[in-house]
C-alpha cells in the first residue's frame, strides 16, 4: 500500500493544543502527521466561544509571537472585542474576544490544510508503539501503524471521558463525540501518575426565546482592538453586543432543593472541577451568602440564534436546568437547544514531564493541554505550541527549549505544572507571574519573536513586520531623546497650554513623556511630530513611563538567573547529600527538578536545602557554570 507511514512528528488530537503543536512542528520543516477522530471538528471550541481574558490573552499573544494560529483565527472570527482592566496598568490589561464558533473552526482548518509539511488523517489512536522506553509510533483504530521520532498527545477531555447529566452518565469525549477508551487503557499501563478531573458547560439557549429588553447591553470597545500582531480591525466580521442578566433567589432555591440530584454533590463525579470556572450549583453551595450571580449572554455566531449563558455551567438533570434557566430575568420563555453537562476525564500528573513537555519515562512522548491538568483554550494552545516545537527539535537532533518564568507566561505555565503539579484544572492569571510588568501582552513579540525565528517558527512576512516594529521603536525613542524643548519657545508654550506643565529648563521629549500627566499622542500633537504606527507608539510610551520599574525587575532577574539556570545532574542521588532531611530528599527525588531554580519552587524545599545543593554541586564539579558567572 503506497500510503505514508513514516513521519518525524505525530500529533494526536485536533483541538487547540493539537492544532498549534502540528502547525509548529510543520513550520519548522518537520514532516508532521495530525491524527484526529473527526476532520470536521478541527479547531472546534468545545465550551464558550471566546478567546483571551485576564492572563489568557498574554498566552494568546505569546502563541502569536511564535507564529501560532490562535490570535489570527480570533481576529478573523471575532464578533466582539474588549480590553479588560483598561484603566489599570499595562501589565494586567487583557484583550478578550467573542468569536463566531463556525468561522473560528473554518479559519483554523484552512490554516492547517494550507500548511506545508503537514498531513491530516482522520483516525482515532488506540495504541502507542513503545520500545525500550522510547516511543516509536502509534496504532490507529483500524490497525494502521504510523512511525515517528516524536509523538505529541493532545487528547483534551477524550481519555476515558464520561458525560454526566443529573444522575445519568454515558461515555463521551464531549457531547456528540465518542471517548478514547482504548488509548486511555493503554496510557494507564505506562509508569505515569494518573488522575481524574472534571469540567462542565451550560445549556445553550435559542436567542429568539430571550427578552433582551430587560437585560444590560454590553457592547464591544471602540476603536475595536485586535488580537494578533499581524492582525487589523479590517479582518473582523460584523460586531455584536453581549448582554448581562443575573440569577436570583428563586434560581438559587431551585438549585439548592435539587442538589441531591446533582452528580457533583451525590458522589457520582470523582474528578475535581475548575476553581475559577465553577458550576452554578457549586457557586450556590460555596457562596451561599450571595443573592445573585452575573450571567453573560454571549452569541455563538452571526449565522445562528444559539446563545451561550456564561455563568450557569451545570450538570443538574434537564428538568432542573429548564426550571433554573426560566427563573432568570429575560429568559422566562427560554428554549434550551442543548442541555448543559459535566465531563470527567483522565489527566496525567505534569510533574512527570520535563520542561520540554516530554515525559520523563518515555523518550519522545510529549503531552499538551488538558491531559496535563490545565483548563482553557489558551493554556492548551500554548502547551501545544511548545510541545510541537520540542517534538520537532528532538526529531532534528537539536536541544529542547522552554522560555523561563521571566521570559514568558508560557514559562510560568510550564514551570508551575511540572514543579507544583495540580490537583484541579489549572488556569492562568497575571497574578501567577512574578515579573508581569515585563511580561505584558503588548510586548510578547519583542520578547519571543527573535527566538521563534531562530527555532524556525517565524515566516519571512512576520519577521519583516517584527523587524519594522522593533526598528521603529528604536528610531522613535532616539528621536524623542535627541529632540529638546526650551522654556519660552513656541513648542514649550504649546506643552504648557496642553498639559499645564511648566518648563523650568530645557527637557528632551523623552524626559517629558516620562511625566505621568503627559501622554504620547498629546506630546506629538503639541510638538508637531508625525504620526507613527500605533503599536510603535504604545511601546515607546509604556517603556518610557515604566522605565524605572522595568529596570528594577530586570536587575532582580539578572541576580536570580545565575542560580536559576544551574542544571542539576540527571543522576544526582539526593539521599547521599548530607544535611538534607528525609522529607526534602523525598520531594526532590520524586519531582527530579531539572534546575536549581525549579528545585527552589518545590513546596517544602527550604532556602537552606538549596544552599546544601549548591555546596554539593560545587563538590562534584557540576557548579562550574555558577562559579564562572559569579
UniProtKB/Swiss-Prot annotation:
<dbReference type="InterPro" id="IPR049312">
    <property type="entry name" value="GIDA_C_N"/>
</dbReference>
<dbReference type="InterPro" id="IPR026904">
    <property type="entry name" value="MnmG_C"/>
</dbReference>
<comment type="subunit">
    <text>Homodimer. Heterotetramer of two MnmE and two MnmG subunits.</text>
</comment>
<keyword id="KW-0274">FAD</keyword>
<dbReference type="InterPro" id="IPR004416">
    <property type="entry name" value="MnmG"/>
</dbReference>
<dbReference type="GO" id="GO:0005829">
    <property type="term" value="C:cytosol"/>
</dbReference>
<dbReference type="InterPro" id="IPR047001">
    <property type="entry name" value="MnmG_C_subdom"/>
</dbReference>
<dbReference type="InterPro" id="IPR002218">
    <property type="entry name" value="MnmG-rel"/>
</dbReference>
<keyword id="KW-0963">Cytoplasm</keyword>
<dbReference type="GO" id="GO:0002098">
    <property type="term" value="P:tRNA wobble uridine modification"/>
</dbReference>
<dbReference type="GO" id="GO:0030488">
    <property type="term" value="P:tRNA methylation"/>
</dbReference>
<dbReference type="Pfam" id="PF13932">
    <property type="entry name" value="SAM_GIDA_C"/>
</dbReference>
<keyword id="KW-0819">tRNA processing</keyword>
<dbReference type="InterPro" id="IPR020595">
    <property type="entry name" value="MnmG-rel_CS"/>
</dbReference>
<feature type="binding site">
    <location>
        <begin position="13"/>
        <end position="18"/>
    </location>
    <ligand>
        <name>FAD</name>
    </ligand>
</feature>
<dbReference type="InterPro" id="IPR044920">
    <property type="entry name" value="MnmG_C_subdom_sf"/>
</dbReference>
<keyword id="KW-0520">NAD</keyword>
<dbReference type="Pfam" id="PF01134">
    <property type="entry name" value="GIDA"/>
</dbReference>
<dbReference type="InterPro" id="IPR040131">
    <property type="entry name" value="MnmG_N"/>
</dbReference>
<feature type="binding site">
    <location>
        <begin position="273"/>
        <end position="287"/>
    </location>
    <ligand>
        <name>NAD(+)</name>
    </ligand>
</feature>
<dbReference type="Pfam" id="PF21680">
    <property type="entry name" value="GIDA_C_1st"/>
</dbReference>
<keyword id="KW-0285">Flavoprotein</keyword>
<comment type="similarity">
    <text>Belongs to the MnmG family.</text>
</comment>
<comment type="function">
    <text>NAD-binding protein involved in the addition of a carboxymethylaminomethyl (cmnm) group at the wobble position (U34) of certain tRNAs, forming tRNA-cmnm(5)s(2)U34.</text>
</comment>
<dbReference type="InterPro" id="IPR036188">
    <property type="entry name" value="FAD/NAD-bd_sf"/>
</dbReference>
<dbReference type="GO" id="GO:0050660">
    <property type="term" value="F:flavin adenine dinucleotide binding"/>
</dbReference>
<protein>
    <recommendedName>
        <fullName>tRNA uridine 5-carboxymethylaminomethyl modification enzyme MnmG</fullName>
    </recommendedName>
</protein>
Amino acid at each position: 500500500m503506497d500510503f505514508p507511514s513514516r513521519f518525524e512528528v505525530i500529533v494526536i488530537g485536533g483541538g487547540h493544543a493539537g492544532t498549534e503543536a502540528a502547525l509548529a512542528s510543520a513550520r519548522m520543516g518537520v514532516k508532521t502527521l495530525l491524527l484526529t477522530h473527526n476532520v470536521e471538528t478541527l479547531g472546534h471550541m468545545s465550551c464558550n466561544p471566546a478567546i483571551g481574558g485576564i492572563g489568557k490573552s498574554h498566552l494568546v499573544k505569546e502563541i502569536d509571537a511564535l507564529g501560532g494560529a490562535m490570535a489570527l483565527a480570533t481576529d478573523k472570527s471575532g464578533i466582539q472585542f474588549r480590553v479588560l482592566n483598561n484603566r489599570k496598568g499595562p501589565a494586567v490589561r487583557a484583550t478578550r474576544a467573542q468569536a463566531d464558533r463556525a468561522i473560528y473552526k473554518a479559519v483554523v482548518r484552512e490554516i492547517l490544510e494550507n500548511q506545508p509539511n503537514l498531513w491530516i488523517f482522520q483516525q482515532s489512536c488506540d495504541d502507542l508503539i513503545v520500545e525500550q522506553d522510547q516511543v516509536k509510533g502509534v496504532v490507529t483504530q483500524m490497525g494502521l501503524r504510523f512511525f515517528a521520532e516524536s509523538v505529541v498527545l493532545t487528547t483534551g477531555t477524550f481519555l476515558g471521558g464520561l458525560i454526566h447529566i443529573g444522575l445519568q452518565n454515558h461515555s463521551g469525549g464531549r457531547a456528540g463525540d465518542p471517548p478514547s477508551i482504548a488509548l486511555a487503557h493503554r496510557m494507564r499501563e505506562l509508569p505515569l501518575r494518573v488522575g481524574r478531573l472534571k469540567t462542565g458547560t451550560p445549556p445553550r439557549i435559542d436567542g429568539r426565546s430571550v427578552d433582551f429588553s430587560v437585560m444590560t447591553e454590553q457592547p464591544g470597545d471602540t476603536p475595536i482592538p485586535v488580537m494578533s500582531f499581524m492582525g487589523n480591525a479590517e479582518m473582523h466580521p460584523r460586531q455584536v453586543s453581549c448582554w448581562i442578566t443575573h440569577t436570583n433567589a428563586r434560581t438559587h432555591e431551585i438549585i439548592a432543593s435539587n442538589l441531591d440530584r446533582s452528580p457533583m454533590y451525590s458522589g457520582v463525579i470523582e474528578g475535581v472541577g475548575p476553581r475559577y470556572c465553577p458550576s452554578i450549583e457549586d457557586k450556590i453551595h460555596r457562596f451561599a451568602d450571595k443573592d445573585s450571580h452575573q450571567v453573560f449572554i454571549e452569541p455563538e455566531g452571526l449565522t445562528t440564534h444559539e446563545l451561550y449563558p456564561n455563568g450557569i455551567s451545570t450538570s443538574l438533570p434537564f428538568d432542573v436546568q429548564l426550571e433554573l434557566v426560566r427563573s432568570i430575568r429575560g429568559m422566562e420563555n427560554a428554549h434550551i437547544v442543548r442541555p448543559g453537562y459535566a465531563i470527567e476525564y483522565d489527566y496525567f500528573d505534569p510533574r512527570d514531564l520535563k520542561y520540554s513537555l516530554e515525559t520523563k519515562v518515555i523518550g519522545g512522548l510529549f503531552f499538551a493541554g488538558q491531559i496535563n491538568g490545565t483548563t482553557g483554550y489558551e493554556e492548551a494552545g500554548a502547551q501545544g505550541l511548545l510541545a510541537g516545537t520540542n517534538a520537532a527539535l528532538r526529531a532534528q537532533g537539536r536541544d529542547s527549549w522552554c522560555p523561563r518564568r521571566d521570559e514568558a507566561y508560557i514559562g510560568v505555565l510550564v514551570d508551575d505544572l511540572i514543579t507544583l503539579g495540580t490537583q484541579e484544572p489549572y488556569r492562568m492569571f497575571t497574578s501567577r507571574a512574578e515579573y508581569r510588568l515585563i511580561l505584558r501582552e503588548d510586548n510578547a513579540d519583542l520578547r519571543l519573536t527573535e527566538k521563534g525565528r531562530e527555532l524556525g517558527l517565524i515566516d519571512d512576512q512576520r519577521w519583516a513586520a517584527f523587524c519594522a516594529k522593533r526598528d521603529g521603536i528604536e528610531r522613535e525613542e532616539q528621536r524623542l531623546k535627541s529632540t529638546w524643548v526650551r522654556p519660552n519657545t513656541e513648542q514649550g508654550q504649546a506643552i504648557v497650554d496642553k498639559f499645564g506643565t511648566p518648563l523650568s529648563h530645557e527637557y528632551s521629549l523623552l524626559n517629558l513623556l516620562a511625566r505621568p500627566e503627559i501622554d504620547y499622542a498629546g506630546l506629538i500633537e503639541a510638538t508637531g511630530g508625525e504620526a507613527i504606527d500605533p503599536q510603535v507608539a504604545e511601546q515607546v510610551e509604556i517603556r518610557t513611563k515604566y522605565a524605572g520599574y522595568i529596570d528594577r525587575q530586570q536587575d532582580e532577574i539578572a541576580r536570580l538567573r545565575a542560580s536559576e539556570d544551574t542544571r542539576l545532574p540527571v543522576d544526582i542521588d539526593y539521599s547521599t547529600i548530607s544535611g538534607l532531611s528525609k522529607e526534602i530528599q523525598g520531594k526532590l527525588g520524586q519531582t527530579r527538578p531539572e534546575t536549581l531554580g525549579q528545585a527552589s519552587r518545590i513546596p517544602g524545599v527550604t532556602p537552606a536545602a538549596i544552599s546544601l545543593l549548591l555546596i554539593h554541586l560545587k563538590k562534584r564539579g557540576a557548579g562550574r557554570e555558577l562559579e564562572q558567572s559569579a
